[in-house]
Swiss-Prot record:
Protein name, UniProt field: Plasma membrane ATPase
Subcellular location: Cell membrane
EC number: 7.1.2.1
GO molecular function: ATP binding; ATP hydrolysis activity; metal ion binding; P-type proton-exporting transporter activity
Compositionally biased intervals (Basic and acidic residues): 1-11
Residues engaged in binding Mg(2+): D636, D640
Species this chain originates from: Zygosaccharomyces rouxii
Annotated segments matching region Disordered: 1-71
Pfam families: Cation_ATPase_N, E1-E2_ATPase, Hydrolase
GO BP terms: proton export across plasma membrane
Extracellular-side positions: 139-142, 316-326, 741-756, 848-859
Recorded family membership: Belongs to the cation transport ATPase (P-type) (TC 3.A.3) family. Type IIIA subfamily.
Compositionally biased spans, kind Acidic residues: 17-50
Amino acid sequence: MSDERITEKPPHQQPESEGEPVPEEEVEEETEEEVPDEQSSEDDDIDGLIDELQSQEAHEEAEEDDGPAAAGEARKIPEELLQTDPSVGLSSDEVVNRRKKYGLNQMREESENLLVKFLMFFIGPIQFVMEAAAVLAAGLEDWVDFGVICGLLFLNAGVGFIQEFQAGSIVEELKKTLANTATVIRDGSVQEAPANEIVPGDILKLEDGTVIPADGRLVTEECFLQVDQSSITGESLAVDKHYGDEVFSSSTVKRGEGFMIVTATGDNTFVGRAASLVNAAAGGQGHFTEVLNGIGVILLVLVVITLLLIWTACFYRTVRIVPILRYTLGITIVGVPVGLPAVVTTTMAGGAAYLAKKQAIVQKLSAIESLAGVEILCSDKTGTLTKNKLSLHEPYTVEGVSSDDLMLTACLAASRKKKGLDAIDKAFLKSLAQYPKAKGALTKYKVLEFHPFDPVSKKVTAVVESPEGERIICVKGAPLFVLKTVEEDHPIPEDVHENYENKVAELASRGFRALGVARKRGEGHWEILGVMPCMDPPRDDTAATVNEAKRLGLSVKMLTGDAVGIAKETCRQLGLGTNIYDAERLGLGGGGSMPGSEMYDFVENADGFAEVFPQHKFAVVDILQQRGYLVAMTGDGVNDAPSLKKADTGIAVEGATDAARSAADIVFLAPGLSAIIDALKTSRQIFHRMYAYVVYRIALSLHLEIFLGLWIAILNHSLDIDLIVFIAIFADVATLAIAYDNAPFSPSPVKWNLPRLWGMSIMMGIILAAGTWITLTTMFLPKGGIIQNFGSIDGILFLEISLTENWLIFITRAVGPFWSSIPSWQLAGAVFVVDVVATMFTLFGWWSQNWTDIVTVVRIYIWSIGIFCCLGGAYYLMSESETFDRLMNGKPLKENKSTRSVEDFLASMRRVSTQHEKGN
């Protein structure tokens, strides 16, 4: 490519200031546009442009209806390497040397061994017991039991591995946010180079639409750009950039031209450091896995206690080692539910498939359980609560000026080029449909001169010719600067001046961005016309969804990069509360200046925070979690990734970046919060199914541990090992269909309440064991007791155990009495099939060496129904007990003084650490 001289004139922008409403956010080209009498061929047809914008708006709405501190320290680049001549760039040899030293411009990939990942699913308390049982079965040459146990192990690992494999790699997705190619100055010429080959010190050319591939700073004097970095900082509109300002990788140039020097690449960029924050976030096992492992440990302890009792009795009777090992195998199989991980994982996988139909993609199965218990929802504003597009509100006009007149003047002071339109211009042109007079008159005016936004005067100026041939100067811009333009021409009446300033102040306090509009006709005086407020509006369904979230026991907190005023106004419209604070009060590292306990109270009671950076979001989630809350975080940008990963449930909303999607636990393809609330209800249904199954399965384990332990210890006899294995298989096969059961959802967040769970499970297990013990012991009465004319003891006990255990699921699945909720046909059918098979086992003596007559089988059914009624009554009484209800739904205990002291100490340490880092 031939050499290209590098000259740059300062482009202009529309204004943004902190002391007043900020109108224009996207970059105009700095070069003044001189429009001759004959319209430029480059200008787009205004009617076609308006129609296209309005058509796009309608299409977007139709689709909706359907539907910088970092964890890791950046590698510093020596300043002498950042003195590249912008007109020449780096030499090819220097590029090669720097690439060798600093590497490619891409995220470092953590290699993942899929085999190791698969083998990790064989680690855990329950898995260890299952593996020990398999080894014991192999030692006894009991290959049937060995095969069944191994099959269950691999089933559990397979389901979990497949689900986790689909989640993908967070670093890989963050890498995808980088641009693909870049325009670079090397060897004195302009070249196209792959983005991953950019090195520190490279000179890059930026223009409209450029996706910036690396961090850097602008080196073109008097340049002005507007850069969309909403996916990084959360700011809803483009940000002004001047000479010497920093720009970040993965952000987009909306308007303007200039050159930048690369100061950081790959992992050292803002996005790269965000990746390190994500990787530093809690990525452990998850709350559900912790609960499951805790249950497994307790069951394992109970198994050991039972085995000690049995071994003591056997040694006292001098029982031979082989029977002792068989007893050990039997207790091991029944004591720890071999199918618990598989059934629960399958239940959640079925729920994930159901959520997928609702356009919610579950990337981690444990997220379903976490979402069901979420108490606080931290939501990003832009694109989540709002539409992420500007809309105009009711204009303020001075006396004697019509709204159409103000609208016409504002639209005349706008670019006629499609590529030159910024968010403000688009909002005005799309809103012309509401001002038919202004729309009809717009095409009759001829543009003579157009001056894009001037960052000094903070306004856009256009000189037009009316249909009558009158020369008119139209301006729009920062309200007070427009007012100053008029005042410099002639005095403004005091009442007009006062009303105008009051309106501007009111709009600023309500969080609106505002544009002042004025004009000058011919040789006359300047006229102030009024103010047009604009805002990124809330989604149509957000307010109703927020109210529904509150009814479901959720506290919603908004975290946004926008100003406090904008955040408060958005919250006011949505009913979120107005306790919105500047994130600076949290401190750079989340510590702030308040004592730790006060900071925790401050975060807990706030309705949201504005002007936040990634570390602020991360800190808010962390503080709430330390207070004992389960926290969900919604987001759509790179800046949300760390807190999405940190949260108990990370939610990537519709339109989220790849980085946010990969960091999230659940990805939504449908827009708005309504889809999240639907998923919340579904997750609570799934949680209820899991909770019912766990209570059921623990009760079954305790049932057989108690019964078999007593039988072996007292009578020196046990059920046939093969029948024990079939009981375990039948119990889990029958309940695999619970994933498709009809289940209610709780009106409040649900959690694993282990005291309540264990209390109910123990009572169910004792009643089951008592029923089976009575069945066994009354057989030896003169007339056979409950079971008369019995054939095989093993066969009868096998049937009684199978029936009562299988029917227990109908009790635990219900919220009230077992008859208050009809089970799904899948669950009822599965239990029926298992009951039929168990009956066939008993009738024909399979594995029990003797058949049983039909009369005895009927008596077993009648006796089992009686036990079932006792179980149902006891479960209902416990579920209606105030004590159990308080344990299940009670709020977390208030922190005590020692907890608050720990919070104060941790906050102090964070402040010391932050000051030390800043000092270095």
